[in-house]
């Protein structure tokens, strides 16, 4: 399905925690197919904020059988878009919404009998909730364990929804809340999610080698630690799926020269295919493909510009690029030639990029 923005109406804004809301959108019948999603995918929202074209990606929290399109937005200190969503968005508002994107997740199979593990922190629960709601209904023989970290009990996003799911799917869903700033009776559930906690809790659920899918979502440091732990315990690399919600604790790439520092003479040309149209975009020193497209007035798909959301994913058909950051492409995607165009800078004078070859 082509990546595109459509203007959708907000039909519901629900306060989930003191600093988080969920927002539901009405999807016109003629756009129903375009907004059909897989559990774990996200939406990119776009709006003018104080004269700026701001876009942010937020995960879908609805299940496949909920018959709604809903995302959760947690307020971030200094975050222009998240603050607007939490304080100003009301039912009836119109917001530009990109069609669902992302490969974090799974397509439920009715005959499957799988062992799922999810490790999340904070708003990282959002895509996990969509997975829980979808898998537990559509895979009646599958089991799910969730390890969910927060500061305090009042910070637990979708607490009631998780309790309802646990009661409804008794014996198939196990939920462990780990709190870093609030004492609980069982010491294991105090502090941050770490290797020791993961190892102990896994033993009560299933051998690590028998985990069919492990979904890790939250801050970078937590994800990296959890991935290393699961790998050490025997979970196959291909069974571990990650979605960074922030890069806290993750090494930052060295700063590159920006296009503003460069002259106006192109150092390369990007030959881009998008929605069946071809573009020849001159690139200045220090520019990414997205930077160059923006300067040329060409609307290329992107959202986070930080290498996390994968909205800008495209196939590098020829030429060479260097990606400053990559928190979202799987190893097989890189081997197949996919790049993040918000991070890709040319290493050859000509590069050919195809957004349509997904």
Which residues fall in each region the model found?
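FNR/FR-type flavoprotein reductase catalytic core
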Residues: 83-262, 269-271, 278
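Ferredoxin-reductase
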Residues: 2-98, 111-114, 142, 150-152, ...
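Ligand-binding loop in jelly-roll beta-barrel domains
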Residues: 64-67, 109-114, 139, 346-355
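Short structural boundary motif marking the start of a folded domain
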Residues: 4-9, 264-270
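Iron-sulfur (Fe-S) cluster-binding segments and ferredoxin-like electron-carrier domains
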Residues: 279, 292-296, 301, 311-358
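Residue-level marker of beta-strand positions
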Residues: 42, 68, 93-94, 288, ...
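C-terminal accessory/binding modules appended to enzymatic or scaffolding proteins
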Residues: 265-305
């Amino acid at each position: 399905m082509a990546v595109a923005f459509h203007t959708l109406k907000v039909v519901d804004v629900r306060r989930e925690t003191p600093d988080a809301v969920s927002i539901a959108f009405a999807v016109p019948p003629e756009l129903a197919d375009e907004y059909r999603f897989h559990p774990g995918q996200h939406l990119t929202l776009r709006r003018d904020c104080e004269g700026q074209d701001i876009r942010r990606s937020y995960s879908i929290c609805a299940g496949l059988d909920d018959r709604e399109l809903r995302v959760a937005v947690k307020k971030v200190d200094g975050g222009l878009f998240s603050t607007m969503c939490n304080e100003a968005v009301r039912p009836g508002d119109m917001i530009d919404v990109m069609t669902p994107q992302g490969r974090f997740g799974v397509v439920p199979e009715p005959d499957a009998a799988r062992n799922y593990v999810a490790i999340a922190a904070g708003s990282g629960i959002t895509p996990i909730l969509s997975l829980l709601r979808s898998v537990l209904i559509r895979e009646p023989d599958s089991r799910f364990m969730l390890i969910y970290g927060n500061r305090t009990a009042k910070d637990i996003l979708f607490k009631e929804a998780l309790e309802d799911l646990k009661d409804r799917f008794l014996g198939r869903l196990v939920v462990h809340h780990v709190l870093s700033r609030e004492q609980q009776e069982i010491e294991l559930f105090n502090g941050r999610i770490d290797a020791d906690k993961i190892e102990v809790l896994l033993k009560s659920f299933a051998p690590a080698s028998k985990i069919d899918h492990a979904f890790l979502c939250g801050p970078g440091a937590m994800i990296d630690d959890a991935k290393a732990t699961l790998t050490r315990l025997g979970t196959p690399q291909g069974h571990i799926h990650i979605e960074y919600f922030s890069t806290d604790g993750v090494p930052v790439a060295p700063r590159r020269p920006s296009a503003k520092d460069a002259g106006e003479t192109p150092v390369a040309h990007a030959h881009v295919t998008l929605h069946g149209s071809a573009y020849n975009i001159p690139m200045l020193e220090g520019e990414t493909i997205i930077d160059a497209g923006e300067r040329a007035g060409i609307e290329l798909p992107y959202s986070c510009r930080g290498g996390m959301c994968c909205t800008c994913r495209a196939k590098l058909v020829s030429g060479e690029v260097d990606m400053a950051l990559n928190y979202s492409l799987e190893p097989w995607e890189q081997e197949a030639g996919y790049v993040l165009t918000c991070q890709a800078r040319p290493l050859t004078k000509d590069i050919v990029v195809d957004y349509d070859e997904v």
